[in-house]
Amino acid sequence: MKEVTEFLKKAGAFYLGTVDGDQPEIRPIGVFQEYDGRLFTAVGQHKKVYAQIMKNPKIVICAMSENRWIRVRAKAVPAEQAIVDRVFADNPFLHTIYNDQSGLKLGVLELTEGEVEFCSMMGPERTEKL
């Protein structure tokens, strides 16, 4: 799964898709981590995206870099506190947003029960299970 994390970091911008009722929604996100072969992302619990994921945990993450792209389809489930602590340690800027003073909480989500599709402009190259 390190390949997924490296691809997303190289791409710079990547996008998280959810469903709001019967309407698809997509937005850029910036936090994506891999720990011990497990994939995680994070969003603010005060945001619509978090409520959408709690209602329907099926998500997609997509990014493009150098005429190749990646699509991660998964179920996003809340991560255990030890992972939340690691995400904060590895992304110190999050403390400026999510802290006791702001009252905002970060929702760290593990990506499970999914697959990663590696593609080029010619079509899918390969698919791997999470």
Residue spans for each PLM region:
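A short, Trp-centered hydrophobic/proline-enriched beta-strand micro-motif
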Residues: E6-D20, I59-C62
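Acidic-histidine catalytic/liganding microenvironments
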Residues: A11, N56, N91
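Charged, gly/pro-rich active-site loop segments
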Residues: R71-L130
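Conserved beta-strand in the GNAT
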Residues: P28-G30
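General beta-strand recognition
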Residues: Y15, L39-F40, V60, R71, ...
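A short mixed-secondary-structure module that forms the rim of ligand-binding clefts
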Residues: F32-N67
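Residue-level signal for well-ordered, solvent-exposed loop/turn and beta-edge residues enriched
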Residues: Q23-E25, K75
